[in-house]
Each structure stands twice: as structure tokens, then as C-alpha cells.
Amino acid sequence: MLQDVMKKSKKIVIKIGSNTLSNVDGTINHDFIEALCQQVAFLVGEGKQVVIVTSGARIAGISRTNKWSRKEDMNYKQALCAIGQVELMSAYNSHFSHHGIYIGQLLLTREDFFDKTRNLNIRNTLFTLVDEGIVPIINENDTVSVEQIKIGDNDTLAAYTATLWNADLLILLSDIDGIYNKNPKEYEDAELLEQVQNIDDMLKEIEVGETNSFGTGGIETKIEAARIVNRYNIPMILGNGKNKEILMKLYQNEAKATIFFRE
């Protein structure tokens, strides 16, 4: 089923989590970004349009400055994101250029999705970029996001983007193969749920874990993202971004993953 969905989908949103994007020491994983860009270039060559939702601005800021990492003051966090966003986009631009692909940046807040004028402007920008062969790269605008207007996690941001753009598929790349009935990092007998059609029924059967190391979204936010896009009949795949060839393996039906969908 994964292969069928991948091949039938023309408009694909791919979300990259902080844990996927970072090395163990918190620095940007350039090998991963290069592998990602190569696979996106393949998908574009197959006639698909791709939008990337990326996390990682804060860890990129910490990596670049090597300070402030333990300061919890909001101003410091936002300053790190301002520094790191430049580093992050520079990395994407450099690696995509190896494949002849240009990128465009969109930094968004919750208000952008729920204000009619802003919503329309984002839609028009996205459609124009992809129609011209550009890969849009989206992140939350952390430097202006306060509690009242922030989305809070990029799983939700990716889900909002997929519905706004009328995507055919949302792919979340995390540091696990998909949804398990219990935490695979703690239990060797954890079983992967390959297909989920009813999220409420699934929640009765699994144990939901904690937030991850570098990011703001744990399993709960990924499940909620699936719920959001499934309402619009958009399937969602949760796969392991630590597998550098994950997109190709999904395309070739060789990867472990969980797909959420509605009949």
C-alpha cells in the first residue's frame, strides 16, 4: 500500500523533525540533508511536487554559536532560531543546488492559516512556487511566535500545510519506524502498526510516550497531525528519517512505516 500511495500522489508534503535533522551532538546532519535532497530531486523528476516542512532552527542556532543552549528565556530561544534559520536554509540551498533545484522560504504562524487573506496569500505563493519547479521550505516563524499565535510543533504545521495546499500525501520523518503498540526504545517485543484506519481505536491499543529529545513534538502530535489530514482524506505516512534512503524505500515498498488513512 505504501508504494501505491507514493506513486499515485502528485502533491507531497514532507516534514523533517529536529531529531531526524540533527546528529547526536545536536549539530546539523548534512549527510541526511544531502540524501533527502537527492531523493526529493528524484520525486520531482517523477513529476511530483514537493513541499518541505522543516524543524531545526534552534538546534542550528546552538550549533552555530555554541552558547545560550541552556538559557530558557524566550528572547534567547527566539534569537537562536533567528540565527539558526539562516544556517538551516543555507544548508538546504547548498545541497539542493547539487541537484539543480531552487528553494523558497516561508515562515508562518497560526494566524497565517486562520486569517482568510493570509491563508489565500500562502496558497497562491505555494501554488506559484511549485508550478515553477521550486521546492518551498516552511518553518514556524519562531522569532515572532508568542503563545497566542504560535502553532507549537511542526507536525501540526505540516498538517495545516497539507490541508491548505490540498496535498495528496503527508510524510512525517521522525526517529522511529512508525507507531508501535508500545515504546520500541524500551520494549523489545513492541509491534509496528503498519496501517491505521481508526485513530480512536488505535489509541485504545497503544501506550503514548513522551516528547522527543531536540524537538517539540512527540508521538501525540504526530497522531493529531494524522487526525487533521485524514479529515480531508489525505493519507499520512510516519517513517524513520534516520534511514537516509527512506523516501526511496517507501517508493519501492521496502520500508517499515505506519500509514494513516480513511477508506
From Swiss-Prot:
Binding site for ATP: K15, S174, D175, T216, G217, G218, I219, E220, T221, K222
One annotated GO biological process: L-proline biosynthetic process
Domain of life the protein comes from: Bacteria
Localization annotation: Cytoplasm
EC number from the UniProt entry: 2.7.2.11
The keyword Mitochondrion is assigned to this record: no
Keywords assigned: Amino-acid biosynthesis, ATP-binding, Cytoplasm, Kinase, Nucleotide-binding, Proline biosynthesis, Transferase
PROSITE patterns according to UniProt: GLUTAMATE_5_KINASE (PS00902)
Cellular component per GO, a single term: cytosol
Pathway: Amino-acid biosynthesis; L-proline biosynthesis; L-glutamate 5-semialdehyde from L-glutamate: step 1/2
Chief localisation class: cytoplasm
Signal peptide stretch: none
Binding residues for substrate: S55, D142, N154
Single Gene Ontology MF annotation: ATP binding
Catalytic activity: L-glutamate + ATP = L-glutamyl 5-phosphate + ADP
Database matches in SUPFAM superfamilies: Carbamate kinase-like (SSF53633)
PANTHER family: GLUTAMATE 5-KINASE, ISOPENTENYL PHOSPHATE KINASE
Role description: Catalyzes the transfer of a phosphate group to glutamate to form L-glutamate 5-phosphate.
Family that this chain belongs to: Belongs to the glutamate 5-kinase family.
Name by which UniProt lists this protein: Glutamate 5-kinase
Organism from which the protein derives: Alkaliphilus oremlandii (strain OhILAs) (Clostridium oremlandii (strain OhILAs))
Lineage, highest ranks first: Bacteria, Bacillati, Bacillota, Clostridia, Peptostreptococcales
